[in-house]
Structure formats: C-alpha cells, structure tokens
Amino acid sequence: MNNSLFDLNLNKGVETQKSDLSPQSASVLKTSIKVSKKYCKGVTLTCGCNITGGK
C-alpha cells in the first residue's frame, strides 16, 4: 500500500514538472529570438540579416 502511494506522488511530481517546463521554455525561446535579432542588427554584414528585413 505504501509503495503505491509513493508511486502516485512521484508521478504527480513528474506531471507538475512537465507542465511547468512548457511556458518556461517558451519564454526562454522568445528571449533568445529577441537577443539574436538585436545582435543581428549590429552585425548585418556578417550574418546577412538584411535579407530578413533587419536594419
């Protein structure tokens, strides 16, 4: 009985981590996109961002 309760709690913890991870990784992705765009504007000649419309 104790083992099944422990398994249940463990699974709950895993599910919570999964749901927490999604919005967090999405915001990290957005941030890195912003940073790369800003960086691209500074080095248009090197990375060729002028093709995508960066100035």
From Swiss-Prot:
Q: Which UniProt keywords apply?
A: Antibiotic, Antimicrobial, Bacteriocin, D-amino acid, Lantibiotic, Thioether bond
Q: Which residues carry this modification: 2,3-didehydrobutyrine?
A: 31, 52
Q: What is its biological role?
A: Lanthionine-containing peptide antibiotic (lantibiotic) active on Gram-positive bacteria such as staphylococci, enterococci and streptococci. The bactericidal activity of lantibiotics is based on depolarization of energized bacterial cytoplasmic membranes, initiated by the formation of aqueous transmembrane pores.
Which molecular function term from Gene Ontology is one that the record holds?
signaling receptor binding
Q: Which residues carry this modification: 2,3-didehydroalanine (Ser)?
A: 27, 32
From the record heading this protein, give the residue positions of the covalent cross-link Lanthionine (Ser-Cys): 36-40
Q: Which gene does this sequence derive from?
A: elkA
Membership in a protein family: Belongs to the type A lantibiotic family.
Its post-translational modification remark reads: Maturation of this lantibiotic involves the enzymatic conversion of Thr, and Ser into dehydrated AA by ElxB and the formation of thioether bonds with cysteine by the cyclase ElxC. The next steps are cleavage of the leader peptide by ElxP and membrane translocation by ElxT. The leader peptide may be removed before membrane translocation, in contrast to other lantibiotics for which the cleavage occur after translocation. This is suggested by the probable cytoplasmic localization of the serine protease ElxP that cleaves the leader peptide. It is not established whether the 2,3-didehydrobutyrine is the E- or Z-isomer.
**Record keywords: Ribonucleoprotein included?**
no
Q: Which NCBIfam families match?
A: lanti_ElxA (NF047830)
For the modification D-lactate, the affected residues are 25
Q: Please state what the protein is called.
A: Lantibiotic epilancin
Location of cross-link Beta-methyllanthionine (Thr-Cys): 44-47, 46-49
Give residue ranges for the propeptide.
1-24
Q: Which GO terms describe its biological process?
A: defense response to bacterium; killing of cells of another organism
